[in-house]
Amino acid sequence: MDSERDANSAASATPVAKTTIARPVSVPRKPASTRPPTKARGNDRAAAVTPQPEPDTREIVLTIEGLVKRFGSTTAVAGIDLTVRAGSIFGIVGPNGAGKTTTLSMVTGLLRPDAGMITVHGADVWGDPTAAKRELGVLPDRLRLFDRLTGAQLLYYSGILRGLSRPTVIARTKDLAIAFGLEDALDRRVTDYSAGMAKKVALAAAMIHSPRLLVLDEPFESVDPVSAANVTDILRRFVETGGTVVLSSHSMELIERICSDVAVVVNGAILDAGTMTEVRQGKTLEKRFLELAGDQTPAGGMEWLHSFSG
């Protein structure tokens, strides 16, 4: 008992430390930054949400699905798929023998495919050729005109065969002659035309019935720069008023300058297609084409050519 009292006395004699409660310290806030947020860098870019392009709601003018054409054991066109929308100038580029002309010949009903389907404004080119060809204006490669006709006669019969009335044909012939600079050439026979003039009168004949889709194979071949600029202006105005153009050309610079969309065709297949910006990927169309089609083969040998020894 005495020991318990002594312990309690000792405990009561020991001073108890007071607990101090710290008051919260007020820290002044920094003003909100007015600087724009920094752009994502490095790996942060992967986390950023890439905005999705808006769906293209323009009317589909031309659809090509699974198009195939063979000549004997050679496959000229190997399953091409392509969609062309209204209001575009769609360029098709490729090396010689790529299948460009063969493809356009099937699109316009001049050559029957071995497989696949082609529709123009919903009309099957081979299932309903009358409806499809009513919408088409065609400038074929290896241009052959009725060279015994004058330019005026060629345009006249082109319009009449398309079902236009005589007064309509005469009025449109006058308009087309002015637009293409052919006023002084209409009374001359087509056989006397230069290659460039023949190309222009053929393009005028392709447009006389006011088609909705122009399919032009090498429209600028043999055409001088002034006439080419004139034709380009006509095609742009045609597109601005609701028309659509599909054309082929070997001139990458020209295709890049005037076309809104492009397809690169090599060995009968499409290697890339889309808007000009999408296909170019920040390069010139020619450089992008060489990447896809393969760079040119270095010219070797032929040392004899530089010997000048006869």
Which residue stretches match the model-derived regions?
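ABC ATPase nucleotide-binding domains
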Residues: 2-9, 21, 25-32, 281-310
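Conserved ABC ATPase "signature" region
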Residues: 156, 160, 168-185
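Conserved catalytic motifs of ABC-family nucleotide-binding domains
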Residues: 210
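Catalytic Walker B motif of ABC-type/P-loop ATPase nucleotide-binding domains
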Residues: 214-218
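ABC ATPase "signature
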Residues: 273-274
